[in-house]
């Protein structure tokens, strides 16, 4: 499975930590983030991750900025993307099981590396349940088509 990962300047170290962790778990990682700590604009990287997932270049995406909010907003502007901001594993798990999220976002200023690993693992291990949740996800996706 291929995972696109993108980040702004606040999240270089956490991106590297999560990338290494993903590789240890056997995932292929596509680095779409910056490796510079000079100030940059998170929407660029949120869009890159979103497009990689929407276009099928990656199966899933991870987006990291200071809080996770801005980069997730940018990713969510890409049609077909369901990005979620998670700061603990339970929400990450349910975002996959109930909302079929395809981009995980978190904040480098909010979660440390160990918690970020736990969030990532919970998200990746969870599977979409379908059923009533599929109907609701389809309703969300219909909003994009209006």
Label for each model-derived stretch:
Residues 28-39:
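A short beta-strand-loop structural module common to alpha/beta enzyme folds
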């Amino acid at each position: 499975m291929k995972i696109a990962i993108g980040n702004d300047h606040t999240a270089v170290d956490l991106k590297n930590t999560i990338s290494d962790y993903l590789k240890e778990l056997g995932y292929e990682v596509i680095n779409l983030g910056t490796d510079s700590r000079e100030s940059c604009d998170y929407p660029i990287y949120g869009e890159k991750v979103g497009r990689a997932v929407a276009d099928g270049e990656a199966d899933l995406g991870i987006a990291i900025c200071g809080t996770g909010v801005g980069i997730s907003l940018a990713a969510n502007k890409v049609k077909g993307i369901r990005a979620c901001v998670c700061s603990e594993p339970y929400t990450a798990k349910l975002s996959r099981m109930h909302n079929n999220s395809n981009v995980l976002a978190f904040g480098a200023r909010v979660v440390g590396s160990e918690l970020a690993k736990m969030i990532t693992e919970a998200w990746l291990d969870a599977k979409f349940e379908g059923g009533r949740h599929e109907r609701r996800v389809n309703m969300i996706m219909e909003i994009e088509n209006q």
